Swiss-Prot record:
The keyword Nucleotidyltransferase applies. The record marks 832, 1081 as: Critical for replication fidelity and mismatch recognition. The gene is Polg. It comes from Mus musculus. It is found in: Mitochondrion; Mitochondrion matrix, Mitochondrion nucleoid. The polymerase domain encompasses three conserved active site motifs: Pol A (residues 866-875), Pol B (residues 922-937) and Pol C (residues 1113-1120). Binds the incoming dNTPs and undergoes an open to close coformation change to catalyze the formation of phosphodiester bond. The 3' -> 5' exonuclease domain comprises three conserved active site motifs: Exo I (residues 179-183), Exo II (residues 250-258) and Exo III (residues 378-386). Proofreads the newly synthesized DNA strand. A motif (Pol B) lies at residues 922-937. SMART domains: POLAc. This is DNA polymerase subunit gamma-1. Residues 507-520 have a biased composition (Acidic residues). RNA binds at residues 561, 733, 742, 747, 842, 848. It catalyses: DNA(n) + a 2'-deoxyribonucleoside 5'-triphosphate = DNA(n+1) + diphosphate; a 3'-end 2'-deoxyribonucleotidyl-deoxyribonucleotide-DNA + H2O = a 3'-end 2'-deoxyribonucleotide-DNA + a 2'-deoxyribonucleoside 5'-phosphate + H(+); a 5'-end 2'-deoxyribose-2'-deoxyribonucleotide-DNA = (2E,4S)-4-hydroxypenten-2-al-5-phosphate + a 5'-end 5'-phospho-2'-deoxyribonucleoside-DNA + H(+). Mg(2+) 1 binds at residues 869, 1114. Inhibited by dideoxynucleotides such as antiviral agent zalcitabine.
Amino acid sequence: MSRLLWKKVAGAKVASGPVPATARWVASSVLDPVPSDGRPPSQMPSSENGQLRLNPLLIQMLSRGLHEQIFGCGGEMPDEAAVQRSVEHLQKHGLWGQPATPLPDVELRLPRLFGGNLDQHFRLLAQKQSLPYLEAAASLLEAQLPPEPKSWAWAEGWTRYGPEGEAEPVAIPEERALVFDVEVCLAEGTCPTLAVAISPSAWYSWCSRRLVEERYSWTSQLSPADLIPLGGSTSASSSTKQDGQEQLVVGHNVSFDRAHIREQYLIQDSRMRFLDTMSMHMAISGLSSFQRSLWMGAKQGKHKNPAAHKARAEVPEESQWSSESSSWDWMDISSANNLADVHNLYVGGPPLEKEPRELFVKGSMRDIRENFQDLMQYCARDVWATFEVFQQQLPLFLERCPHPVTLAGMLEMGVSYLPVNQNWERYLTEAQNTYEELQREMKKSLMDLANDACQLLSGERYKEDPWLWDLEWDLQEFKQKKAKKVKKPASASKLPIEGAGPFGDPMDQEDPGPPSEEEELQRSVTAHNRLQQLRSTTDLLPKRPQHLPGHPGWYRQLCPRLDDPAWAPGPSLLSLQMRVTPKLMALTWDGFPLHYSDSHGWGYLVPGRRDNLTEPPVSPTVESAAVTCPYRAIESLYRKHCLEQGKQQLEPQEVDLAEEFLLTDNSAMWQTVEELGCLDVEAEAKMENSGLSQPLVLPAACAPKSSQPTYHHGNGPYNDVNIPGCWFFKLPHKDGNNYNVGSPFAKDFLPKMEDGTLQAGPGGASGPRALEINKMISFWRNAHKRISSQMVVWLPRSALPRVVTRHPAFDEEGHYGAILPQVVTAGTITRRAVEPTWLTASNARPDRVGSELKAMVQAPPGYVLVGADVDSQELWIAAVLGDAHFAGMHGCTAFGWMTLQGRKSRGTDLHSKTAATVGISREHAKIFNYGRIYGAGQSFAERLLMQFNHRLTRQEAAEKAQQMYAVTKGLRRYRLSADGEWLVKQLNLPVDRTEDGWVSLQDLRMIRREASRKSRWKKWEVAAERAWTGGTESEMFNKLESIAMSDTPRTPVLGCCISRALEPSVVQGEFITSRVNWVVQSSAVDYLHLMLVAMKWLFEEFAIDGRFCISIHDEVRYLVREEDRYRAALALQITNLLTRCMFAYKLGLNDLPQSVAFFSAVDIDQCLRKEVTMDCKTPSNPTGMERRYGIPQGEALDIYQIIELTKGSLEKRSQPGP
């Protein structure tokens, strides 16, 4: 039934996906368990008890019992030639014969598996989970929908409209399927204002109480009563998973609409699921980030010739075989993500009118009331447009993502849930107060620096200051009217002036004792006379008061005028955004003072230049200093820096990787690749067709010059900045040397502040303290708007389950609620989930205000958070693809072996090997390794090397990158075409071939050159095939590229198609990097979907009370009832085992290494944090989670501990103790 419906909705036969090797399960009926009476092959090495199993490469595999339960009995051993080829490959890379310590076997009886193999098992589970929602979707597609009502009811709550438009109030729309859209008046907060829905039988509208009932003000705190009811009662007694039938809600960016549905905030999960047309569009015809910029440029008419964009980022990747012009057909089969463009792509017709939306964005509630009918029609048109898009999308989606696990996984991903309590509000308050306090302290430090700098005016000392010499030091003279001459009384001229005696007078040296009454009276008279004298001068003041006369110009610009409503004393306008601030703080880069250039942005001055000390500026285009630069002072400053650092000359040294880079999830690594412009120009294709060796191209501005320092290398020198005695170097920009740095306080420079490269100069503590505070507040400054605007709904006691209210830890005065993260379940072309706050949040750091954000997600009493990180997920996926491609054995490639058997302690893991090969830190090597797997080219490595170690020259970075790629990715080799073989024979050309018949790039170019010369420069296609050879990762990249360049790229496990906008038929040889990246990242999404399906099955099968919370890249978290926590942990371990086995099975590897079968640890905790032992101490949480919030450390359990606690069973029993 389910398969027929799937085919019916898809409109095409469901593809079976990649065909694995012969199944090794004994065929069984759907309900039969996997038989387990077979034995491993006799030639397989095993222990005395028959459980320990090693493959021919001596890698420990699943124990015999687990292998039989999952893969069945029997199995073919790889042929001797494949084994020998693998051993020789491992020997070549120094990995064969490395010692390995066997892991204890895992004795575990798995739940009953269905079908004849793992693929059938997952298909049956996913079909069971998604079938009710697929049936609901089919009812929408097949229905003849009613016409839109001509008039909309002005009534609070839901209204149903009959066939003739008659309005009838209803409690909720009792429908199995709805297309739904919510509109919010942003001026009034996050409370929903109105909504429209359509079902196969009727239209519905909803109006909020705040819209219908006019009040002076409403509370800003949301309660369930403010939200839209859509799924029954909100009382805890009736809100269980078993209540009601399955409901499907369809919307465009439906996670926004879900956040305004009342029942979705209940702790117990509901049976309502959501399908997002925006996510389905990304999976069907989504655009990569660079394609989107091209598409938008073409749409706006800014670039009539899209080929002009080839100078940027991704389009100029490796061309597949030649440098022929790019294809732009992909622009016709894709679009941006908004509803209007998506509707135009799939449906066509007149463009959607989006102007009324501005009333919700900028208007007030009164504006919405006055335009109620028009705005309801606008919302209804969006609903109808979404329905039309859905009609076209769903069959396409099921055809291009045919495995039912994909749909079931996306449905589960769409119900993310983050529980919070009163600590959330406390966190917001503490973080904001700490931020404001530090802001005030930083402001005072900066004002002190400005006031101190003014003192340099005395004796013109500023002229010898390495930073302040070029500021505006001109003084504004004090102006006054001419005074009228008045004859002074003689008595006034004879008044004694207090303190006017000569210096050294005894009256200044001795204590005169307490003043007498006469002296007191005399002083009072003197003060009064002086005051009168000052008052008499008021007539001399100019009509328009001067602004701080007697102060330098730069200082006057920092002080508000007296008539300014926001007047405050001193240089109160000073901020980090001002160009004068880095100078006042005396910032240095490696000991060189920072300097700002109008044409090149922020840089620094390197002393030692002599060729421009006497020469005037060459031309008007050359920047020159209007005042003399104190280059001697700069030389002295740098010498002092070198002595303090204990060095006479800079030497290249490794800089530790900032935690921000490591804490950025690996999914963000692809964004880093794109930001750095890592994608190679069509250099390879040009090299194949040319007779020139590959040049090392330096940026024009950084080309060797006649004048440059010998002791310093950097981004420069830029000699058009003519500073006498100094060279100007630009600060390095994360996007490349051609970009200017606008502020040295940007977050990209935080790692340089931490490692001491960028620091405040000498002269007091104000500068270093301001720099330190800037680092501390950087996270909250950038994220507080997103965090503070999170939509939190607090639940009344009646909506809380009894397990919460009866728990000893329940606080009667506390608040319990939830945040629904607005996750786009497929927000990128790789189908990765996207959400701006929670999916990108870093972990807590002791020097970052508010960075304890994730720990504020706290389980309610009686519940815990159970989750785990998938160890090296993408590395393993890439490795197992390479292993299957090379010899069909786990660990048969060097890359696969290091992933499985490598140990950090022995330096044999992937990251340690790369670090040792290139001479970089292991942390840096980790970034490079992920970048390569994501498809980044050698240019990426060069730029990232220079970003991590700015002291490297471009030549040194290029050499390191070339060495790294030669060892890891290998060298490109080519197989000659028939024409190529004929030319070699006819021209009698000497060609050096490998054992497999591959030729080098040099030989390929030689054949092309000679053939062209002998045939009057005819162009010959002499290469039929190309591959990577000789590297630790060559076979893996060959497999990834073979998938990426196939006619219809599909993920190897679930068979999901790449976006139509990246199919080879429309992009030809372009966007190779995006396509290679897609293979790994999209396979990782398959991994997540398999996990979600398996966990849902085990929770339902064994009555584990829990629900999915969130998935952050390679980790998953579930909210689980406390008494079920250990069973949920075991379910997670079994899920990981079956998911990895599914990958191996689909690739023809009917086995799995023991080292990757289970999570290294499953976390059981009361809050969301990276490690259960992290106390999350930060400036806003200085005492930690336990002392401040009462949250103790959690548990991290491995598979052996979990089996001991649960007796290896998922069945419910009396709860074991910890």
